[in-house]
Amino acid sequence: MSRISILAVAAALVASATAASVTTTLSPYDERVNLIELAVYVSDIGAHLSEYYAFQALHKTETYPPEIAKAVFAGGDFTTMLTGISGDEVTRMITGVPWYSTRLMGAISEALANEGIATAVPASTTEASSTSTSEASSAATESSSSSESSAETSSNAASTQATVSSESSSAASTIASSAESSVASSVASSVASSASFANTTAPVSSTSSISVTPVVQNGTDSTVTKTQASTVETTITSCSNNVCSTVTKPVSSKAQSTATSVTSSASRVIDVTTNGANKFNNGVFGAAAIAGAAALLL
């Protein structure tokens, strides 16, 4: 019986050693890993309470879930109190104190090893990260290519538009120039045609008549010069005491210039009389001047 007992004890020891050597690999964010980390963290707070108080006084923004305070003073029975804390919050708290690397990290590693737990980033997370990086790189490349293509297209479009605008401007300029030349040519042609028509259809012939309209103001004399069939006639109307007499006589071509001069002189005198008849004794000066001019033709 003793041999059986010894063998049984030996088998139990071997089984225990085998069980202890079995390691379970878990994610750092697994709940069992988080609970082990929190257990070490709470125990460290209880053992170094004054350090944590001083740290919290210097870092007002470092907050702790109320479950941590309850666990510290629970006397070691706090496992169920910490199940609601997220993995990100656990990581923030344990790595936020200055003694994490010198004291907490080693204690957490030892506690995980005692439980047969090894932590590693899951393959799916790595693949997802790699895939995300690859997709991001591909998207960036595609975006860059798209941007370059868009920029090139915009540049080509702008160049094409500029070319079209330039061509349109050139065409418009050509059309405007052509239209201007056409209008100028048409106007010149019309002017030339009018001049030609005037020269051919309205020559100064012996049958045309030229007249000088008389100017009569306040009963003063007036002179009318008419040209008919190359003959110059001079008509002189003289008025005195409301009785007027008219004399018409032909003059030679030599006298024509004289008659024209008389007409011009008479017109000037009449103009003066018109501008102020009362200033010249009711036109007496004007009548005398016309009579004197008419005497030159007799």
Curated annotation (Swiss-Prot):
GO terms for molecular function: structural constituent of cell wall. Extensively O-glycosylated. The GPI-anchor is attached to the protein in the endoplasmic reticulum and serves to target the protein to the cell surface. There, the glucosamine-inositol phospholipid moiety is cleaved off and the GPI-modified mannoprotein is covalently attached via its lipidless GPI glycan remnant to the 1,6-beta-glucan of the outer cell wall layer. Keywords: Cell wall, Glycoprotein, GPI-anchor, Lipoprotein, Membrane, Secreted, Signal. It is a lipid-anchor; GPI-anchor. Residues 1-19 form the signal peptide. Belongs to the SRP1/TIP1 family. It is found in: Secreted, Cell wall; Membrane. A lipid is attached at N275 (GPI-anchor amidated asparagine). Residues 276-298 form a propeptide. Residues 122-168 are annotated as: Disordered. One of its GO terms (biological process) is fungal-type cell wall organization. Induction: Induced during anaerobic growth and completely repressed during aerobic growth. Component of the cell wall. The keyword Acyltransferase does not apply. It comes from the Eukaryota. The lineage of its organism: Eukaryota, Fungi, Dikarya, Ascomycota, Saccharomycotina. GO terms for cellular component: cell periphery; extracellular region; fungal-type cell wall; side of membrane. PANTHER family: CELL WALL PROTEIN CWP1-RELATED, SERIPAUPERIN. This is Cell wall protein DAN1.
